[in-house]
C-alpha cells in the first residue's frame, strides 16, 4: 500500500520565480515523485534588471536562465538599490514582512502542507519561518519538517532576532555543495546551530538542488519519518 505523497511548499532563490524553480527541480521531482508533491510559489518583489551585482554576477550565472524573465526576491539587503547580496552586512532590509505575508496567504490558498523546502535566499527565508513557528509567533505555520538547500544566516542586523530565540526543533535537512561559489559551504554550516539535530546532505557540486541517484536514500530516509 503506497503512502500519500507529502505536500511540500517550495521557496525559490533570488532572481528566480516559482515557475523557473519548478523547472530547475525537475530531477528532484522525478527522484521523489512517489513520496512528495512539490508546490511552488513566487516572491512578491520583482527584482530590477541590474547589469552587475556583487553576488549577483555569480548567482545569475549559476541560477538564472533565459526563462527567468520575471525575476523575484524575498527581500533586499540594499534598500536603495533594491538588490540583494547574501554576504552584505546591513542594518535594515526591504520586503521581508510582505514575503512572510505571501507565505501565509499561500498556506491558506494552497495548503495544507506537511513541510517546506527553500533554495538559497529561499532557504534563508525558510529558516526565519521555522524560527517564527518555534517562537509561536505565527499560528498559521505548522511545518512538520524543513529542507534547506544552500541556506545561510541573514547578515542583516534586523534579522538577528530569528537566530536569538529558542533553538528550532522542527526536523531539518540541510543540503549544500562543497563547490558552491554563491553560498559557500561555511555559510550553510553557520546556520546549522539554529536547528536542533540538523541533518546534513553534503554534495560535491555547486549552487543547485542536487538530485543524483546517490542522494535518493538520504532524501527518502528523511521524508519517511513524516509519512
Swiss-Prot record:
Top class in the EC scheme: hydrolase
MF GO annotations: hydrolase activity
Gene Ontology cellular component list: cytoplasm; nucleus
EC number: 3.1.1.1
Catalytic activity, reaction form: a carboxylic ester + H2O = an alcohol + a carboxylate + H(+)
Keyword Hydrolase: yes
Keywords: Hydrolase, Serine esterase
Signal peptide positions on this chain: none
Active site positions, chain numbering: 120, 180, 207
Sequence similarity: Belongs to the LovG family.
Name of the protein this chain belongs to: Esterase OVCA2
Protein species of origin: Danio rerio (Zebrafish)
